[in-house]
Structure formats: structure tokens, C-alpha cells
Amino acid sequence: MKVQLNSLEKDYHLSIAYPVKADLAESWDLIASNAGFTKWFPQLRIEEDKLIFEMEDFREEMELLVYQENQVIAYDWDGAKVSFHFENRDQCSYIRFEELIPKDFGNEFSNAAKDMTGWLVQNECLTAILNQQKLPDIDQAREKWQAFVAEQIK
């Protein structure tokens, strides 16, 4: 995975790019469909033009900004903007994740550093799934990416 985290004036820009063995349709289905969400982010689902995040006593509806099948999905993420871009390259699929997140992002569950760490862990898991590899140890992945984010934003 190629990872870049840049500090802008008011935001952080996180970019993660990686090739996967899975074809474009399989990659899209995992990352941008309700059936796929159940495999890597079961709290998410798409309803019409909304992305729904739901767990126990919490429900958040976020605007689906772009949905171009097999190309790009982008959505509001509680004030941040998240997108996945899909391409065919050299006999594999290529995925680019981007998040533009306000430096002052935060709610009762998260802040900018935790959110970016979470997306780094999720993308590491997506890479493993789409390459038919064993999932990483989540705690180890979280520790690794927490340290990376902390170093980048200090």
C-alpha cells in the first residue's frame, strides 16, 4: 500500500493506493455494495442516496456524494469526505482511497487521528480480502497505523 498523509491549512488529506488481484467488479462489489459492506464494515449500508451507519442505539445518515459503478464511490463521513476510486491497471484492479478530514473533526466516538487510523486498518483488511490473503491482526494493525498517523500529524 502506498500511503500519504498531508496536513493542509484546515484539513488532513489521507491517500491510500494499492493494487489487488480481484477484478474490478469484485473489488467494487466488496467496497461499494450492501452485500460487500457486510464482509468488512457491517455497520454500513446504502439506502437510496444515503450511506447509513448504524450500531446499537446510534444511527447516522450521510450523503452519498458520487456513485459511478465500477469507478468511484464518495460520501460524506460526518463532515469528512471519503472516496474510493477504481481502475483496471496491468491485469489487476487498482484502488485509491482518499479522505479529506477537518483537523477539528470529532464527535463522542472519534477524532481525526482515530478516524484516519481506522481507515488505514480497513484498507489493509480490504487489501487482504481482495488478494485472498489472511486478514491482519487488527490490534497490531491499529498500533502500527496509530503510530504512523501520530508521527505524520505532530
What are these regions (language model features)?
Residues 15, 52, 107:
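Conserved short-loop catalytic and cofactor-binding motifs
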Residues 19, 25, 35-81:
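Glycine-rich portal/gate segments that line the openings of hydrophobic small-molecule binding cavities
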Residues 29-36, 69, 121-128:
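Short, intrinsically disordered, mixed-charge
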Residues 76-128, 139:
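Beta-strand/loop substructures that line and gate deep hydrophobic ligand-binding cavities in soluble
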Residues 8, 67, 85-89:
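Short beta-strand micro-motifs enriched in acidic
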Residues 128-154:
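Short, highly charged C-terminal tails/helix-capping segments
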Residues 11-13, 50, 70-72, 90-94:
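A generic structural signal for beta-strand entry/edge sites
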Residues 1-43:
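Hydrophobic ligand-binding cavity/cleft-lining segments
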